Amino acid sequence: MMNIELAPSGEEFTLSPTVIKVIGAGGGGSNAVNRMMSCGLQCVEFIAANTDVQALSYSTAPKKLAIGTKVTRGLGAGGDPEIGEKAAMEDAEAIASALQGANMVFITAGMGGGTGTGAAPVIAKIARELGALTVAVVTKPFRFEGRAKMMLAERGIEKLRTHSDTVIVIPNQNLLSVVDKRCPIKETYLVADDLLRKSVQSISDLITLPGEVNLDFMDVKNTMEGQGYALIGVGEGEGENRAVDAATAAINNPLLEETRIEGATRLLVAVRGSENLSMGEVDGVMSVVAKTIDPDAIIIHGTSIDASMQDRVRVTVIATGVPQASISIAGDTHSSQKIKTSSYGAVSTGVYISSDEWNRAKSSKQPNLPGLATRNSAVQETRMEKNGVKGHTFGVPLPSVNEDLDEPTFLRNRNKGL
């Protein structure tokens, strides 16, 4: 064991590693936690919180919180975020106890449902009050799930942003740009869970794994604390142009909200490769990133060596302080080109695509989602009114038939005078 001698300062204190906790809220969040655990995510404590006791019993998290049993009797929130919110408030002390001692808390949830949408902002508020760096990584519904659910998700994300240091949003709709249309439903949702896992892992690895140019918890905290919306991209490359390809794929990751980092005020760039990673390749990565962002943006970079990378290079880019106008609220992707999960280009691996594939998809002029019939929103609204759902749900005015959800929320509200 290595002995570390501390310079005397006259003060007594205890050295301890960074404590990172991940809490999954609701069914979607619990599924993401299961995925992270099955992939062997290290140096992280896992918690699952749900109003549905039966669903909670299937969680593999070592700590399970059945929240809101007085409100829901353990039967779930029924898709109502207000019930999810009340459930989390009912068991605020239990949530605080589970999160106690954490330096960093990740909150993961599927937005648009009941428990995740309602409970996640409450959990974020508790975590932040405990002094933890609070990062939410959440998904938004598929477009076919309807306008009402999308509006609930957007409202939940806005609440979450208020109480979190940073929010990373992954629209499920964008999965359709990278999986084959014949991909089974179960596998598609596994890809969504894996995206949540990769987002959390790419950040936690920066803190827990050593590097040649090291990044630590304070680097991550200074980049993400109080920054609102964030974008994260992870790209891998191999071959002669592996570093540049990895950087290009990272900043053009189509699976997040439209990845436009131009307005970011802070960036954290991590480069990981094997022992043959050269300084010239690191310089190439930073050059690609620098050409994309504001020259006055603060950039923190780190480099680490991992023998298991072999001939591959992985680049992680975390961009924070992103203006809301740079975020695609509707979560659309303008590409209709589908990429089979078994046929990625030679310079890309996992669920990410190469720079060449990205450029081909981006330049495609075909209409989005061919074969899907146009949903009749008027019929949907009529059914909702018959069921007594009218006016506001979870504090959200239901959208009219004529509203364009491709327009960002803040612009729609401004036009309404809100």
Swiss-Prot record:
Annotated segments matching region Disordered: 386-418
UniProt GO BP: division septum assembly; FtsZ-dependent cytokinesis; protein polymerization
Gene3D superfamilies: Tubulin/FtsZ, GTPase domain (3.40.50.1440)
Primary residence: cytoplasm
Annotated GO MF terms: GTP binding; GTPase activity
Highest taxon of the lineage: Bacteria
The keyword Nucleotidyltransferase is assigned to this record: no
Residues annotated as binding GTP: 27-31, 114-116, 145, 149, 193
Location within or outside the cell: Cytoplasm
InterPro entries: Cell_div_FtsZ (IPR000158), Cell_div_FtsZ_CS (IPR020805), FtsZ/CetZ (IPR045061), FtsZ_C (IPR024757), Tub_FtsZ_C (IPR008280), Tubulin/FtsZ_2-layer-sand-dom (IPR018316), Tubulin/FtsZ_GTPase_sf (IPR036525), Tubulin_FtsZ_GTPase (IPR003008)
PROSITE patterns: FTSZ_1, FTSZ_2
Keywords: Cell cycle, Cell division, Cytoplasm, GTP-binding, Nucleotide-binding, Septation
GO cellular component, one term: cytoplasm
Quaternary structure, from the entry: Homodimer. Polymerizes to form a dynamic ring structure in a strictly GTP-dependent manner. Interacts directly with several other division proteins.
Matching PANTHER family: CELL DIVISION PROTEIN FTSZ-RELATED, MITOCHONDRIAL DIVISION PROTEIN FSZA
Family: Belongs to the FtsZ family.
Role description: Essential cell division protein that forms a contractile ring structure (Z ring) at the future cell division site. The regulation of the ring assembly controls the timing and the location of cell division. One of the functions of the FtsZ ring is to recruit other cell division proteins to the septum to produce a new cell wall between the dividing cells. Binds GTP and shows GTPase activity.
Annotated HAMAP family: FtsZ
Protein name in the entry: Cell division protein FtsZ
Organism: Treponema pallidum (strain Nichols)
